[in-house]
Amino acid sequence: MNKEHLLKVDPIPDVTIKRGPLRSFLITKPCDNLSSLRTVTSSKEKLLVGCLLIFTAIVRLHNISLPNSVVFGENEVGTFVSQYVNNIFFTDVHPPLVAMLYATVSSVFGYKGLFNYGNIGTEYTANVPYVAMRFFSATLGIVSVLVLYLTLRVSGVKIAVAAICAVCFAIENSFVTLSRFTLIEGPFVFFMACAVYFFRRSELYLPNSCKANKSLLAASIALGFAVSSKWAGLFTIAWAGIIVLWRVWFMIGDLSRPIGSSIKYMAFQFTCLLAIPAFIYFLIFSVHIKTLNVNGISSSFFPAEFRKTLKYNNVIKETVAEVAVGSAVSLNHVGTAGGYLHSHLHNYPAGSMQQQVTLYPHIDQNNKWIIELAEHPNENVTSFQNLTDGTIIKLRQLKNGCRLHSHDHKPPVSQNADWQKEVSCYGYEGFEGDINDDWIIEIDKKRSEPGPAQEHIRAIETKFRLKHYLTGCYLFSHPEKLPEWGFGQQEVTCAYFAREDLTSWYIEENENEISLPNPEKVSYKKMSFWQKFVAIHKFMFYLNNYMDTSHAYSSEPKTWPLMLRGIDFWNENGREVYFLGNAVLWWSVTAFICTFIIGVAVELLAWKLGVNILRDKHIINFHYQVFQYLLGFAAHYFPYFFVGQKLFLYDYLPAYYFGILAFGHALDLISTYISNKRNNTGYIVVAIFMVVCFYFFSEHSPLIYATGWSSNLCKRSKWLGSWDFYCNSLLLSDSHYELNAES
């Protein structure tokens, strides 16, 4: 490969348009030498790729052991790694693949899962292989740079421009920072990038050919890994599906192709892109469920049927089936993972100021209630009496003697909901209560087990509602947490209008001094894999929808393209890791996307006026490729406007990756047209852009590598006033650091 080859070989073949009987049509069959033009085949290009990898490795691995303490995000992922090593069950908002990979790496290096990750800044001990885990993440980041280069090549970017774009990506501050730590986002970007590359590579070969199918298979596997790392992988699958439809649209318009082959192509593509990722996703969760077989804190949010399958669980082995007047019972909520009806010796700060009633996910004495007939409170029961549909009861707390109570007060958190009333625990030992303590049992026959459980209350098997006798509202709970004064437990109210499952309850523990001879016992049924799979995903949805959305460094999607603010990952002794993108590349991508959209609108207007557009093969390829990548950008960006969960700037990186691919084609077009007129001037322009990117990277590298820098340099590096990395705690200049060291 000589200089002429590096700069001048054109990977864009001519566009072939033929005349048909009624219309002209585009030939969609790839030319015979397309794959050789757009893949790494020569020894000199392989050498170039090797140099690119070495450069990227230096950038990504430099001082990877620093800081030697926990940074933002590592405390969460590290905790999951420890639980994996000890087989303790947990569930995160993300699928488990990345945590499994980090756990595998840590186990290889002898980690026993005993380190308490605690808070950001906790110093790692010698028995934590944090460098190995960071090295694993960085290695995937290094390969991601190669994958970006290869993706640009298969989509028609010239070797020199693809290499320059890859260098810009290698020194993109946000991707460098993300790949150097034990985080979920780095491996996810790698899997997504691989999926994009192999999917685009399949276009180089004849549809349904062996080589095309191999690339499609690799893309589908990568998609499976991506969606098993973050649900954002679903956006990548959706993008690939849209591109398949885009390709088929052109194929159907190609009169030289039978329509049957186009339909066969579409069916095979969708089968692979959906079935293979789904299989991998289920497989990963199967391993996850089988590996984590020890009861943990997270399992308390799962149904007892689920917890029963875990080692060292505290689920009752069996309980007396028949529930009667005088039974001491615990009531479990059906509709949420909140747990048991609970009351503790703390009052509401407003409203009635009576004792709080909540849902509590752990087994506790404050969960136990005595069932009394409403007309005979405090009665010493001497005979066994079943609880049937319509029975009016009171529930007296076993430990404190107060009764479950509702009245015309606003609930503690849902104060603006007129359809809810406060529920409290009111009274004391010896007090007979009042009519506000009365509740009517309504058995839910549809949800209850067929048979006797539909006729009277049986533990575990009967699902029922409790209707307040005086007001007609139903005992209700929903995924709304009480503030600090309620210990973050789940709110319980009395609701007039609500989903049936949110007003449904069942009895778990059931103790009665007066029981039938040889009382029947019942227990929870064991869950199948599919039932566990569904239960885990219900809880993941719950976490995504109801977890706290506030954070000091959370941000809104509308601010991401402008990068108004970064994220403080770590800060200690005048050194800081601050997540921030390379503003030169970041803002260039944003500007290009806006310019392209405006340009396309102008072109469409010109076309409407009869102007011939898109006649040059380079312009055609530019639009074809950029349109596909900007679809990927949109698919990974706009869904976040409709997501209610806590979001951070790094959630923009998958969309940004697609934006970089599109921008690479803009640089390629610039180099092509300027160089055609002025020799290699276009490449010089692109190289200058790379140098400016490197300047920003170098200037802000202390925020990546946690190295010291002066206050003056730090302040000069704030291109925007909203970038809030710390400068005031630093010494004024390097000379002051030297004097400080000497003293």
Swiss-Prot record:
Lumenal side: 1-46, 151-158, 202-231, 286-583, 645-646, 705-743
Short name of one Pfam family: PMT
Domain MIR, first and last residues per copy: 320-374, 384-444, 454-510
CDD domains: beta-trefoil_MIR_PMT1-like (cd23283)
A GO cellular-component term linked to this record: endoplasmic reticulum
Residues listed as glycosylation sites in the UniProt record: 33, 213, 380, 386
Pathway: Protein modification; protein glycosylation
GO molecular function, one term: dolichyl-phosphate-mannose-protein mannosyltransferase activity
UniProt record similarity statement: Belongs to the glycosyltransferase 39 family.
Protein's UniProt name: Dolichyl-phosphate-mannose--protein mannosyltransferase 5
